[in-house]
């Protein structure tokens, strides 16, 4: 039985991971759960899974959880120190790590697991978007086993040969007969909405994805298609793809999760209902297929498939991400940081929906390119970009 750490345990991916673990209790012992501040939810998880360790990034939440655990006669060790969490991830208490902390906040923990040579289930796309070559170099150096969890990258992975699956980050796509990776996206809730109405879009409208049940941040990213842009960058690094080997296709039904086109004209697609428990079950099962607890795809009830090219006037964030992808790690780090600030501001109704892309572009244009030498350097750039975005909001974009 493997020892599993779940980072982002109280979020959407954490929920789905724990659901799959419930269906397959013989596979994993959950030894570490990490979250930000959801004390009541974490208490319930401690009751059910009895992890050895719990990490809360909020000191106040950690203190509250300690008191509740004591009152309930539960003996989990509660941490509120990031360094201790990083040490635990590298220890013998952990074999496998579900890296599902949203945003740049998950970079250090994900890299700690990689550096320690752990089996890493990568659900935090921002970590790879920011660190790119540094991340892949760390995987190669440590020998960590990297499994893509995002439904699209998981679909691509399943459609590749075993040789390519075993060379994540250094794939020779052309040498193995791959012509192109076809990355699908639904187009979000505003695929048909008139562009003239975009400025009036509310957070409540934007978080209602037509097919997927997700957290607020990723739902907004799906509405702007920044999420697909981040996935484009992630695919570039995971599969060592060049610009000619990556294509984004709008597929509103979200049944085909991505495809791989081969040189002989064949296209291999991975399909299934839009439920994250399916790719999570795939990575948790490793070499075997396991129960995900989801319904099978009903081909007789499934909608007709449709495909179209993305409209960059409708999705300017997608264009910004594609352009940043091959400009270097500084650009992708700034893109991600500025977007996180912009999405938070939109959710707080401080800026308009249309100002998300405007803000990201302005922050990108403020910074000159520079060579990235370390993760610490990346985090400095990340901080600078966040400050720039916040200053622009205060100065120019208050609704």
From Swiss-Prot:
Q: Known catalysed reaction(s)?
A: 2-C-methyl-D-erythritol 4-phosphate + NADP(+) = 1-deoxy-D-xylulose 5-phosphate + NADPH + H(+)
Is Metal-binding a UniProt keyword of this protein?
yes
Q: Which residues bind Mn(2+)?
A: 150, 152, 231
Sorted UniProt keywords: Isoprene biosynthesis, Manganese, Metal-binding, NADP, Oxidoreductase
Annotated signal peptide: none
Gene3D superfamilies from the UniProt entry: 1.10.1740.10, NAD(P)-binding Rossmann-like Domain
- Entries under InterPro entries matching the protein: DXP_reductoisomerase, DXP_reductoisomerase_C, DXP_reductoisomerase_N, DXPR_C, DXPR_C_sf, NAD(P)-bd_dom_sf
What the record says about family reads:
Belongs to the DXR family.
Instruction: State what protein this is by name.
Output: 1-deoxy-D-xylulose 5-phosphate reductoisomerase
Origin species: Psychromonas ingrahamii (strain DSM 17664 / CCUG 51855 / 37)
List the taxonomic lineage: Bacteria, Pseudomonadati, Pseudomonadota, Gammaproteobacteria, Alteromonadales
């Amino acid at each position: 039985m493997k020892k599993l750490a779940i980072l982002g345990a109280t979020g959407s991916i954490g929920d789905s991971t724990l659901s799959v673990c419930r269906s397959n209790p013989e596979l994993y012992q959950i030894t570490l759960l990490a979250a930000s501040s959801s004390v009541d939810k974490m208490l319930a998880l401690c009751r059910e899974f009895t992890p050895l360790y719990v990490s809360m990034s909020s000191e106040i939440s950690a203190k509250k959880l300690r008191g509740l655990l004591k009152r309930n006669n539960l003996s989990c060790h509660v941490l509120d120190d990031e360094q201790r969490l990083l040490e635990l991830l590298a220890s013998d208490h952990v074999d496998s790590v579900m890296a599902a902390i949203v945003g740049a906040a998950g970079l250090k923990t994900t890299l700690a697991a990689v550096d320690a040579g752990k089996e890493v289930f990568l659900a935090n796309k921002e970590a790879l978007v920011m660190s790119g070559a540094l991340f892949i170099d760390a995987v190669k150096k440590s020998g960590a086993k990297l499994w893509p969890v995002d439904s699209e990258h998981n679909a691509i992975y399943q459609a590749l040969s075993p040789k390519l699956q075993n060379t994540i980050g250094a794939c020779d796509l052309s040498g193995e007969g791959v012509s192109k990776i076809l990355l699908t996206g639904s187009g979000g809730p505003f695929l048909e909405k008139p562009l003239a109405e975009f400025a009036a879009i509310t957070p409540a409208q934007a978080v209602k994805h037509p097919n997927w049940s997700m957290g607020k941040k990723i739902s907004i990213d799906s509405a702007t298609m920044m999420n697909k842009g981040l996935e484009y960058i992630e695919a570039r690094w995971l599969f060592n793809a060049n610009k000619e080997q990556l294509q984004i296709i709008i597929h509103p039904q979200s049944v085909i999760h991505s495809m791989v086109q081969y040189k002989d004209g064949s296209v291999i697609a991975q399909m299934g209902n839009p439920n994250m428990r399916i790719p999570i079950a795939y990575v948790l099962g490793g070499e075997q297929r396991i129960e995900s607890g989801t319904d099978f795809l009903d081909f007789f009830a499934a909608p007709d498939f449709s495909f179209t090219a993305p409209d960059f006037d409708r999705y300017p964030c997608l264009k910004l991400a594609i352009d940043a992808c091959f400009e270097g790690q500084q650009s992708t780090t700034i893109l991600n940081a500025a977007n996180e600030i912009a999405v938070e501001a939109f959710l707080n109704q401080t800026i308009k929906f249309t100002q998300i892309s405007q803000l990201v572009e302005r922050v990108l244009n403020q910074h000159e390119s520079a060579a990235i030498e370390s993760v610490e350097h990346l985090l400095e750039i990340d901080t600078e970009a966040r400050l720039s975005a916040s200053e622009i909001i205060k100065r120019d974009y208050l609704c």
